[in-house]
Amino acid sequence: MITEEKMQNQHNYSVDDIKVMEGLEAVRVRPGMYIGSTGSRGLHHMLWEIVVNAVDEAANGFATIVSVTINRDNSVVVEDNGRGIPVGIHEKLHVSGVEVVYTQLHAGGKFNNDSYGFSGGLHGVGASVVNALSEYVEVEVATGGKLYSIKFHSYEDSDGNMHSGIPVAPLAEVGRTRRQGTRVTFLPDKRVFETIEMNSEVVAKRLRELAYLNKGVTFKFTDNRLKDENKNREYKYDGGIVDFVCYLNSEKTPLYKEPIYFRGMRGTGKDAIIVEIAMQHNDGYTESIFSYVNNIPTTEGGTHETGFKSALTKVMNDYCRRTGILKEKDAPLPGEDFREGLTAVVSLKMSSIQFEGQTKTKLGNTEARTAVEAIVMDELTPILENLKNSDLAAAIADKAVKAAKAREAARKAKTMAREKSKLENAPLVGKLSSCTGRTPEQNELFIVEGDSAGGSAKQGRDRRFQAILPLRGKPLNVEKRRIEQVLENDECRSIITALGTGIGEDFELKNLKYHKIIILSDADQDGAHIRALLLTFFYRYTKELITGGHVYMGMPPLYKVQKGNNVTYAYDDEELARITKGMKGYTLQRYKGLGEMNPEQLWETTLNPENRSLVQVTIEDAAYVEHLVTLLMGDKVAPRKEYITEHANFNRVDSFEDKIG
């Protein structure tokens, strides 16, 4: 456990706790190495790095309020009521602690476990990276009744040399205050980013997620660019991750009223690992496990998820044996049966996090698995044995037994899906027009709505690297079906075979035949429905294709503008307005479907990599995506109708993150 001496050391967070590792020179040269991209995702990553510093104060018990404000000029303010960045003079660098944190890469109290027990920052480099990539940064620290301020700016000198994150003047005391904490204002540099406009909904969703993960902490969000009711929002969840699971299951039918919740700790001092788990089964067929470490979403899972799954399987099999649900002669049920319809949130707090790869989305610490397994075994077992919870335990076991029967029914269908030789005579033959290229990294698969458009696409494509799979009917809504029903559907089976990866538990990314999978559908309600059905299929059964960046949506033009022999295509209403501004004597054609374009037009506008627009499908907020898929594709009609009425605009593309040529 965390000792009193340890807690005292953490309260005594001072300038001496700041460790310096290297300088800041490379950030402007290669920003992608630090924030991933200079597009929308990288822009928001800047905000997350400052927010996570504030959240770390809350996670370690030193702050209760975190607020974010987006101003009309696109500058952003992040404020907390924590301890405040140390303002004393650093012994080695002879400048204030604030200046060290914002000008030195790998500088901060997070490298010292006495200052932070748990930290979710970008290996401590976040503040300095934000400074390097901003037009200006202003930091105010309120501590000990005094207010301190320092401003940094980035500028180009007369010789054209760029200077990034330079202090305008040293940290100065500017007044007295009753406040406590840190306030950071920054303006992302438009010389670095493709856009400096933060997406209000992206920010709100992430702050809501953080509020669920940090029980009792208030997150305030103000967007001064807005004038509607969404200008000011506030999130606080006294139920923490229990409320989170209730939100995730809000459009589903739970099997028991209240989520199961337990918490435990393993290890002491800097080796302490705190585990929080909330879980609830519903009557659906897919498992939805959301894992986090120090508030960081681990969308690819890792050792903590593995530990949760293995312990849950053992605890439930032991329960089924004790209660006679499983006889002595019966084999134990596999974990997937106990996880059918499960919604769970697994949240860890630990120091010295180790991630696999550079994305920080898969936890690699072996001790995390051991801790989670032990805590699940110790905490879940007595919950199930409590007579008050007999209905709950029976519901989980009954669900698993039914899943086992369905799994056996699906075994033959799964085998067929895996064995190419048995599927070569399936409906796929004569349907897929494959490409001649044998390099998956270069090959593209277009999944096209309708035989008519599919025929034009087959004629217009570059058959060296582009394959065409027309859909003759609507794919199955997999949200409402078990896997054996999915495998019986011709359209789904054709897609599975074309991809080559298998699905679900049998998915193997290394077998992917096409590294770009492009959905082509009409720009109308039917086309939107088909896109939704396909994306639901990919999300539920081949999620790694989305997280790996392999799934795209093609953006065919909405309009053809012709004046004389000159033809121009417009992909949305705004582009049409720009093209036709001041133009006279033109003819306008509104495309109602892909089938209205001949092969040459389809190649020129939609297939040709030199001209086309693609939208990459990404998962920025896994929990929100889960909620939305359930809302739009699940059984409950009223909330779906309400959402579509409020949000649907089938010609909008600006909600997508990046267009890719």
Regions found by a protein language model. Give the residues of each.
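Short conserved segment of the HATPase_c
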Residues: 85-108
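Conserved short strand/loop->alpha-helix "switch" segment adjacent to the catalytic nucleotide/phosphoryl-transfer site
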Residues: 29-47
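C-terminal interaction appendages of subunits in large macromolecular complexes
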Residues: 405-424, 439-444, 455, 459-461, ...
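Residues immediately C-terminal
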Residues: 56-57, 84-85, 525-526
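GHKL-family ATPase ATP-binding module
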Residues: 1-17, 24, 48, 56-58, ...
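Surface-exposed acidic, glycine/proline-enriched linker/cap segments
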Residues: 101, 107-113, 164-166, 308, ...
